[in-house]
Amino acid sequence: MTAILERRESTSLWGRFCNWITSTENRLYIGWFGVLMIPTLLTATSVFIIAFIAAPPVDIDGIREPVSGSLLYGNNIISGAIIPTSAAIGLHFYPIWEAASVDEWLYNGGPYELIVLHFLLGVACYMGREWELSFRLGMRPWIAVAYSAPVAAATAVFLIYPIGQGSFSDGMPLGISGTFNFMIVFQAEHNILMHPFHMLGVAGVFGGSLFSAMHGSLVTSSLIRETTENESANEGYKFGQEEETYNIVAAHGYFGRLIFQYASFNNSRSLHFFLAAWPVVGIWFTALGISTMAFNLNGFNFNQSVVDSQGRVINTWADIINRANLGMEVMHERNAHNFPLDLAAVEVPSING
C-alpha cells in the first residue's frame, strides 16, 4: 500500500488579504473600491463634523470679511455650514501643508476643499463598489448605473461648477441655508429655472415620486390575502417565498380602467426598469445642465420679447423672473462688487448735447 502525502501550500499574507477583501461572505462587503472608499469617506465625515461644530469664520470672498459657519461661532443647525474655500485661493489645491499655519488654512476655508475632494472620491468608489459586489454575485450592473445620477449631481455642484466659475468659493456650501443661498445665487446668475435640462430634472424628481407612490399603493392595494383581519397584512409574506405576494393582473386591470389600458404596465420587469430609469435620466440631465451653466451657457432669455405697436414692452412671466433675478444679483456678495455684472452690462443710453 502506497500513501501519497500532498503538502498544502500556505497562502501568503497578501493572498489572504485579497480573499478577505473580495469575499462576499463578510457581513459588509469591502471590495477593492472599498479600500479607497472607507478612508476617504471617514476623513470627509470626520472633518465635516469637527468643522461644523468648531471651525472659525472663513474669508469666502477674499475681501477680509470672514463669514461664520460653525455652531461654536453663533450658528444653529439651520444656519450652520462648512464655508467654501476663499476666492483668494481660487482653484488652487490647498492642503494643510500649503498654508503657512493651520490658522491661515482655516481662515481661507481649507476644510471645505478637504471635505469635498475626499467626499467625491468616496462616493465614486461607493458606486464602483456597487458594481463590484454585483459582479461577484453574478448580478446585472444597473444598481451602480442608477447611483451614477446622484454622483453626477454632487460632482456638478462641488467640482464642475467651481471649475467653470474659476474658484471653489463658488461651490455649494455644506449646510442647509448655504444650499438655499447657492440655489438663489445660481438662479440670479444663470437663470436655471429657464433651462430645459433643469425642467427635465424637475420632471424626473417629481415624476419619480409620483410613480413610486402609485406603484407602492397599487401593490399594497392588490395583496393576496394570507392573514385574518386581526393580524397585520405584512405577516402574510415570508422572506424568500416563491409565489407572488400581490396580484399584478388585478393591479393592471385597476390602473388600466382608471386611466386607459396602455397606461398600465403588464410586464413587471419593464415596469421596474421604468421606475428606475425615469428619475435617473432626469437627474442626469440636471447634472448636465449645472455643468453647462458652470461655463455660463445659461437658461433661456426671453426678456422684453413682447412689445406693442409703439415699441413699448409688454411684460411676460419671463420679465417678472428677470426682475427677481436682478434683485437677487445685487444683494449677493454685496461688498465684493462695485457694480453688479448684469446691470453693468446694460448699454448706457447716449445723451444728445
From Swiss-Prot:
Positions where N-acetylthreonine occurs in the chain: T2
Residues bound to Fe cation: H215, H272
GO cellular component annotations of the record: chloroplast thylakoid membrane; photosystem II
Amino-acid positions noted as binding a quinone in the UniProt annotation, renumbered to this chain: H215, S264, F265
Binding positions for chlorophyll a PD1 per the UniProt entry: H198
Protein family per UniProt: Belongs to the reaction center PufL/M/PsbA/D family.
Protein name (Swiss-Prot/TrEMBL): Photosystem II protein D1
Gene source species: Secale cereale
